[in-house]
Amino acid sequence: MTKKDKGPKFANVTTKSGEVVKVFEDLNDFETFIKNETEDEEFDHVHCHLKYYPPFVLHESHEDPEKIKDSANSHSKKFVRHLHQHIEKHLLKDIKERIKLPDLKFKDKAKEESFEHIVWKYNDVTQYHGKDFEIHITVECHNDSAIVDVDYLTKPLTAAVEA
């Protein structure tokens, strides 16, 4: 008897504007969802959110969130450096693989810093199966926790209508 393959676990959250956003707490579930949406041809209109401890933080705490150091936050240069490396070398790379666009470059990058948080924004316009769409990824870390927020949004590009 084989074990049933369960889909990614997430919660649906409705925003003030009425949009339903899928919220994930596991990186693998998040990546699986993105992969499934791409395979289902719904890749150009996805909005989901991920709240997770980065793998390097869990590794340092021996996979126990209770043992994560209080210093693992946006005020720690080491944490920020490792998080940025994780984003650039793993998170973005894995997303590109899941949506089957390994050549995606995220040319439009930005970083915003304040006392409360650091935000990295990655944007690009791309095409898949003949459909043009925008992809926006926002990664945020805070001054009071090692939890990282990732917002993933894709929107179809509509051709400008000439009057």
UniProtKB/Swiss-Prot annotation:
State the compartments where it is located.
Answer: Cell membrane
Q: Name one GO biological process term.
A: energy reserve metabolic process
Identify the keywords attached in UniProt to this record, alphabetized: Cell membrane, Membrane
Mind telling me which GO cellular component terms the entry cites?
A: plasma membrane
Indicate yes or no for the key word Cytoplasm.
no
Q: How does it sit in the membrane?
A: Peripheral membrane protein
Q: Is Membrane among the key words of this record?
A: yes
Give the family, as the similarity comment puts it.
Answer: Belongs to the RGI1 family.
Q: Which named protein is this? A: Respiratory growth induced protein 1
**Function as written in the Swiss-Prot or TrEMBL entry:** Involved in the control of energetic metabolism and significantly contribute to cell fitness, especially under respiratory growth conditions.
Q: Which InterPro entries match?
A: RGI1, RGI1_sf
Q: Which residues form a coiled coil?
A: none
